[in-house]
Amino acid sequence: MLYPTEFDVIVVGGGHAGTEAALASARMGAKTLLLTHNIETLGQMSCNPSIGGIGKGHLVKEVDALGGAMAAATDEGGIQFRILNSSKGPAVRATRAQADRVLYKQAIRRRLENQPNLWLFQQAVDDLMVEGDRVVGAVTQVGVRFRARAVVLTAGTFLDGKIHVGLNHYTGGRAGDPAAVSLSSRLKELNLPQGRLKTGTPPRIDGRTIDFSKLDEQPGDLDPIPVFSFLGRAEQHPQQLPCWVTHTNERTHDIIRSGLDRSPMYTGVIEGVGPRYCPSIEDKIHRFASKDSHQIFLEPEGLTTNEFYPNGISTSLPFDVQLALVHSMRGLEQAHILRPGYAIEYDYFDPRALKSSLETKAIGGLFFAGQINGTTGYEEAAAQGLLAGINAGRYAQEKDAWCPRRDQAYLGVLVDDLVTRGVSEPYRMFTSRAEYRLSLREDNADMRLTEIGRELGVVDDVRWDAFNRKRDAVSRETERLRTTWVTPKTLPVDEATALLGKPIDHEYSLAELLRRPGVSYDGVCGLRGGECGPSEPLAEDELLLAQIKEQIEIGIKYQGYIERQAGEIERNGANENTRLPDGIDYTEVRGLSFEVSQKLNQFRPETIGQASRISGMTPAAISLLMVHLKKRGLGRRKGTDSVPGADVQADNTAAQQ
């Protein structure tokens, strides 16, 4: 048998975006090839050993709801789990986990090697095969040519990557890996708009040289221990470890200031812009000069290593300065640095040159995902990779592209922000970026997306069965609470007083009682007349039971707010999803200013909603566009054709609550 050289989809890069892209397209039945420069680094956590966080955890849950691997791999490799913002409302609660780098990478590789329709091949890609205005394949560094209907490029920080430590620099995709110089040059020939960004990583420390007696311990959540995947179990977690906390001080800051004359950031050597929300320690000292201390988290890298990741001191200062600043902190006076911190500059491409499917507008069948689009973070990369993989598979199968709306998923917010607003610095997801965050919670990601994922072909039978059991149980139990009543005669005074603080004076449904502050689902079910709850085999599944209770309680307690938000979504959606024709010349739209028509012709928004979010767009311009479309009978609602998920949002409103 000849070695296969023709595929439906080729994925270039084996990081968080590439692995999710390859798995997604293969799950859909597309014959997929994953090309990576080193099979041993598939799924590698290049920077921090953690997954999740505010906004990021929401993306991981959405990837999981669509059948992705990140959440499940984190459950298998996670060595500490916490719920952030646990005392706040459900919209901003977020899961975060420390992961054993080796276990996480093994979990990802195991899934890749056992995924039907997926081939792996270790070779860097030096060239893309482009015929006319579409991509038709990729060429490896030794000249092997693979053809495909679609190519997903997930190059991370490797495109013309340059690593900086002090005033020394060298080419590299990350420490120990070569940069993709030839591929970068080839992409520049395609005249896609591009720029340079920068990110960084801290020095790593040998835990045997840390004095933990001087540090504050930060354990994970233990009762209950969180899980990331909707199918996960706490029993899957390996041994759990604490993190530790120290702080910078005035001496630390003086050491950093003394080295700024040899900092590549402050001497103009680095041209790329770094991430605003994950700044280097030298940037923190400069931007927050009045602050005399910064918190530093010492995070274990795994169960079989002594290496610690000091979260909060990402730096590109010279090594002698790195050593001095580490030794200036409490508990690290004798610390041995195993690896120096560094900054890395790399090419990215303006995401406004992409469709919402993450396909480039200029070259058919070429998809970009991850840091190549100007984002930062494993979670943002994985979410984009999943979407690009789905749409590359659909492109190869000659089906319409799919992308969730802003009111459907954080993934929709992420993509819409990228393709309409672009980036001037590495983009990080936050809950504050979503207009409808009460509807886009971690706990209901499956209710929002799993049915769509099933239609797309990325959700398997096991997940689909678990989802249906949960959805049906939530619906049945919510209805029971709304139709079960207690009266002053049936509810003893002592029970009412214990739960509500006073006896009831008239008839209430259990749902009405649950809506009161401080009243829990278990408390209501403990009342005389309120007994029951999810039954049959569900009660034996503790995790599923906990998920069901959480959905019911949030849905009932926040019902008014959720319904109000749903009404707002419906009102705003009237024009939000109206498509703009591909070939429209905006200079011919009467009344539009030259500036507005120029921007519309440059960025080619797909919908009225996207057009409204372009910088400089005015309400008057949007009104003129709507008049133009109506006069010519153009425009249709996005999602009203054969694209999956067109009707799922409305059908699942009650289940989401």
Curated annotation (Swiss-Prot):
UniProt xrefs under Pfam families: GIDA, GIDA_C_1st, SAM_GIDA_C
Compartments in which it is found: Cytoplasm
Gene3D superfamilies cross-referenced by the UniProt entry: FAD/NAD(P)-binding domain, GidA associated domain, C-terminal subdomain, tRNA uridine 5-carboxymethylaminomethyl modification enzyme MnmG/GidA
Chain sites annotated for binding NAD(+): 274-288
GO biological process: tRNA methylation; tRNA wobble uridine modification
Record InterPro entries: FAD/NAD-bd_sf (IPR036188), GIDA_C_N (IPR049312), MnmG (IPR004416), MnmG-rel (IPR002218), MnmG-rel_CS (IPR020595), MnmG_C (IPR026904), MnmG_C_subdom (IPR047001), MnmG_C_subdom_sf (IPR044920)
PROSITE patterns to which the protein is assigned, alphabetical: GIDA_1, GIDA_2
GO MF: flavin adenine dinucleotide binding
Coiled-coil ranges (or none): none
Principal localisation: cytoplasm
The UniProt record lists the keyword Flavoprotein: yes
Signal sequence bounds: none
Cofactor(s) demanded: FAD
Presence of keyword Flavoprotein: yes
Keywords from the named record: Cytoplasm, FAD, Flavoprotein, NAD, tRNA processing
An example Gene Ontology CC term for this record: cytosol
Binding site for FAD: 13-18
Disordered, as annotated region: 635-657
Subunit structure: Homodimer. Heterotetramer of two MnmE and two MnmG subunits.
NCBIfam families referenced in this protein's UniProt entry, alphabetically: mnmG_gidA (TIGR00136)
Recorded family membership: Belongs to the MnmG family.
Function as written in the Swiss-Prot or TrEMBL entry: NAD-binding protein involved in the addition of a carboxymethylaminomethyl (cmnm) group at the wobble position (U34) of certain tRNAs, forming tRNA-cmnm(5)s(2)U34.
HAMAP family: MnmG_GidA
Protein name per the record: tRNA uridine 5-carboxymethylaminomethyl modification enzyme MnmG
Organism field: Burkholderia pseudomallei (strain 668)
Gene name in the database record: mnmG
